[in-house]
């Protein structure tokens, strides 16, 4: 199984496998040769324009197909995306199917569609997708995620969602799932004789189905034993969704943290001076024995043009990455909050080309090991108000 992940948080249910951040031949061969029968390729296409996403998906698929010539595996290709239905759909699965067919693969005629993310309370019941909030089930189309600047949608009925996005619902299998038992049953179906064993499969899913297909066992949540050194950590918060803001406010109430706000407008107007000021402040905070919490101003700058919105997001992310690259101290751990932010920190700020997934520090929050410290990839839309604080309190000295 090869999972093409459209942002870096898709490993939030697995452990032990490889995450590769490039799709050159050597990197993909490393994934195929690994002892685990599955690996993740971080394409990060959710942060790209439609045209960029198509090109990257095609490049990654072409390399997967090329390397598999030496292995001859029946391929299960997973397009891992958002449990709140944001992302380049059906573009990515269309490109995956096209690449396989073009190289002579027999591909199962239906594309399973499984946005359920059990750990975070994202469930599909009778073809309708919900977000669990305590005892309530909220249709995802009624959440802020449905009003996303780039990937907005208007329905929680998955057949209607598929049609809204320009695809034919009859080409998909809607996977209803409220728990892992249902996902394990569907995983058994995928490998049963009902589907020809010579057929490869293309799947669109969130994070839970790949775990069910892989068959990996559960493991305990990670703890302080992952730390290589004592001292304070560092939080970099780029996501601006409501849940992140609530988590940020709670984190900043914890004794031992210190807020460092980065004004997004100043990134656009006066980035060099702002960078100098921010790095100086981080050093002062660390000298006081406090954990710096660097975050972008919470007011979203709304733009009508989708490409301009993507460009703005990239400018902000580049600034945060530069902070990580130029950190004036070595943290005991680093937390990146938000999809674009955590990806760019991983690949640019830390320069990681491949990494072993350690597991999760708290439910649905994955961790990989950088050269000198663990790096925690915290999705923007996961957890409750205390979740960032929980990570801080779990790892503080």
Place the predicted regions along the sequence by residue.
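Cap/lid and interdomain-hinge subdomains that line or gate substrate/regulatory clefts
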Residues: 1, 5, 12-15, 27-29, ...
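Short glycine/threonine-rich loop-to-helix capping motif typified by GTGT followed
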Residues: 86-92, 305-311, 344-351
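Conserved, well-ordered active-site substructure
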Residues: 17-21, 330-332, 340-390
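Gly/Ser/Thr-rich loops at beta-strand to alpha-helix junctions
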Residues: 8-10, 81-91, 118-120, 179-182, ...
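N-terminal short beta-loop-beta anion/metal-coordinating cradle
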Residues: 12-40, 277-290, 356-372
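C-terminal structural cap/anchor segments
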Residues: 282-337
């Amino acid at each position: 199984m090869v999972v093409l992940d459209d942002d870096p948080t898709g490993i939030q249910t697995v452990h032990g496998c490889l995450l590769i951040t490039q799709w050159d031949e050597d990197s993909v061969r490393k994934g195929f040769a690994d002892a685990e029968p599955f690996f993740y390729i971080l394409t990060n296409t959710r942060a790209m324009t439609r045209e960029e996403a198509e090109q990257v998906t095609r490049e990654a698929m072409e390399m997967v197909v090329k390397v598999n010539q030496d292995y001859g595996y029946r391929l299960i290709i997973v397009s891992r995306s958002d449990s709140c239905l944001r992302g380049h759909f059906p573009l990515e699965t269309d490109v995956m199917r096209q690449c396989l067919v073009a190289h002579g693969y027999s591909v199962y005629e239906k594309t399973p569609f499984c946005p359920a993310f059990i750990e975070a309370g994202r469930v599909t019941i009778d073809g309708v997708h919900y977000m669990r909030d305590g005892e309530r089930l909220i249709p995802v189309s009624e959440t802020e995620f449905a009003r996303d600047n780039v990937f907005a949608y208007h329905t929680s009925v998955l057949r209607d969602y598929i049609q809204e996005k320009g695809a034919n619902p009859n080409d998909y299998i809607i996977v209803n799932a409220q728990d892992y038992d249902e996902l394990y049953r569907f995983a058994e179906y995928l490998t049963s004789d009902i589907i020809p064993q010579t057929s490869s499969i293309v799947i669109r899913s969130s994070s839970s189905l790949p775990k069910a297909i892989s068959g990996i066992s559960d493991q305990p949540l990670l703890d302080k034993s992952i730390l290589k050194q004592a001292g304070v950590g560092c939080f970099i918060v780029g996501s601006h969704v409501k849940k992140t803001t609530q988590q940020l406010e709670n984190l900043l109430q914890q004794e031992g943290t210190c807020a460092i706000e980065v004004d997004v407008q100043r990134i656009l107007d006066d980035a060099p001076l702002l960078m100098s000021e921010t790095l100086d402040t981080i050093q002062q905070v660390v000298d006081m024995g406090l954990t710096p919490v660097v975050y972008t101003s919470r007011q979203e700058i709304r733009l009508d043009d989708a490409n301009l919105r993507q460009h703005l997001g990239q400018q902000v992310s580049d600034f945060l990455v530069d902070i990580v690259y130029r950190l004036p101290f070595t943290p005991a751990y680093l937390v990146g909050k938000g999809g674009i932010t955590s990806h760019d920190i991983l690949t640019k700020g830390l320069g990681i080309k491949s990494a072993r997934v350690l597991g999760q520090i708290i439910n649905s929050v994955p961790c990989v090991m950088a050269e000198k410290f663990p790096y925690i990839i915290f999705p923007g839309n996961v957890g409750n108000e205390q979740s960032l604080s929980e990570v801080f309190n779990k790892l503080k000295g």
